[in-house]
Amino acid sequence: MTHIMFTFSTAFMLGLSGLTFNRTHLLSALLCLEGMMLSLFIALAMWCTQNETMMFSSAPLLLLALSACEAGLGLSLLVATARAHGSDHLQNLNLLQC
């Protein structure tokens, strides 16, 4: 495993561990998801440049576009949750109530 690959794997695992262990606020969960997507984007871009393949050259841009859509959807859910419940605490959200 190269040094660069280890760095991006560690960044992804830190985002994943932050997502699993720190589930108090919706905003912190969204930030962990964005960190994971950023590490995936950089790793995919580095992989495409190392292999010098033109077949997968559009994959990082597609991942970046999906990440932007995910961020927009997450922020809209954050605003809707803050308006409906008054805060973004995940413990206050009960999915069984309408």
UniProtKB/Swiss-Prot annotation:
> Where does the chain cross the membrane?
1-21, 26-46, 59-79
The protein's annotated catalytic reaction(s) are:
a ubiquinone + NADH + 5 H(+)(in) = a ubiquinol + NAD(+) + 4 H(+)(out)
Listed InterPro entries? NADH_UbQ_OxRdtase_chain4L/K (IPR001133), NUOK/Mnh_C1-like (IPR039428)
Q: Where in the cell is it found?
A: Mitochondrion membrane
Membrane topology (UniProt): Multi-pass membrane protein
- One GO molecular function term? NADH dehydrogenase (ubiquinone) activity
Q: Which GO terms describe its cellular component?
A: mitochondrial membrane; respiratory chain complex I
State the Gene Ontology BP annotations: ATP synthesis coupled electron transport
State the top-level EC class: translocase
Ordered alphabetically, the record's keywords are: Electron transport, Membrane, Mitochondrion, NAD, Respiratory chain, Translocase, Transmembrane, Transmembrane helix, Transport, Ubiquinone
Q: Which family does it belong to?
A: Belongs to the complex I subunit 4L family.
Its function, per the record, reads: Core subunit of the mitochondrial membrane respiratory chain NADH dehydrogenase (Complex I) which catalyzes electron transfer from NADH through the respiratory chain, using ubiquinone as an electron acceptor. Part of the enzyme membrane arm which is embedded in the lipid bilayer and involved in proton translocation.
* Protein name per UniProt: NADH-ubiquinone oxidoreductase chain 4L
> Lineage of this protein's species?
Eukaryota, Metazoa, Chordata, Craniata, Vertebrata
